[in-house]
Amino acid sequence: MVIQRKYRASRRLGVSLWGRSKDPFNTRNYPPGQHGNMGYKKPSDFGKQFGAHKKFKFYYAISSKQMRNMFLKAYKKKGDTGDNFVGLLESMLSSVLYNSGLVPTIFSARQLISHKHVLVNGKVVNISSYSVKPGDTIKLREKAVNLPPVLAAIDAQEQKVPDYLEVDVKERSVKYLRVPKYYEVPYPANMEVNLVIEFYSR
């Protein structure tokens, strides 16, 4: 299964990235591969930085190039670089939709967006990295509200909806209230943004 392959990231990094019950890491908490059951090696300082970078990359399902561009943008902004960086990541359309709990995974969020099933303030947006602004309302289109993944996500209620989102399950919509700080994001895994900053500052 495609989703199972994507969840391999959790086993490679040694942590349940998305905190989902179907995550193979919950039952096989060792690296994938022939010699995986030998366990995880203690990483070097660079290894820790690279691992932290990978966690964010996989968690948000973005490319290394997108990650770097977002970091550079965050670095140039006034304020705390870590907060700026996480704020940019959490403001992506795919992140807002996933965090709403209306979809089961970040991957399904990106798929619904690319298939033009998502509206932002009443208009179709099919770019997952689209930057949502405070006050924007994201809604699933009529033909998507009863799709199996959507119904399953709502029924499972595995996603902890953060305080900076206002979700209307009945309307299949979510309002983005404000850009969060790093400490406000309810990551299911230990996400060390300070190590990401160190990684890009080498």
UniProtKB/Swiss-Prot annotation:
GO molecular function terms noted in the UniProt entry: rRNA binding; structural constituent of ribosome
Ranges where the S4 RNA-binding domain occurs: 91-168
InterPro entries reported in the protein's UniProt record: Ribosomal_uS4, Ribosomal_uS4_bac-type, Ribosomal_uS4_N, S4_RNA-bd, S4_RNA-bd_sf
Entry keyword set: Ribonucleoprotein, Ribosomal protein, RNA-binding, rRNA-binding
Assigned GO CC terms: small ribosomal subunit
Pfam families, sorted: Ribosomal_S4, S4
Domain of life: Bacteria
UniProt cross-references to Gene3D superfamilies, sorted A to Z: Ribosomal Protein S4 Delta 41, Chain A, domain 1 (1.10.1050.10), RNA-binding S4 domain (3.10.290.10)
SMART domains: Ribosomal_S4 (SM01390), S4 (SM00363)
Any one biological process term the GO annotation gives: ribosomal small subunit biogenesis
Matching SUPFAM superfamilies: Alpha-L RNA-binding motif
Family as reported in the entry's similarity comment: Belongs to the universal ribosomal protein uS4 family.
Function: One of the primary rRNA binding proteins, it binds directly to 16S rRNA where it nucleates assembly of the body of the 30S subunit. With S5 and S12 plays an important role in translational accuracy.
Assembly mode: Part of the 30S ribosomal subunit. Contacts protein S5. The interaction surface between S4 and S5 is involved in control of translational fidelity.
The protein's name in its UniProt record: Small ribosomal subunit protein uS4
Species per Swiss-Prot/TrEMBL record: Ehrlichia ruminantium (strain Welgevonden)
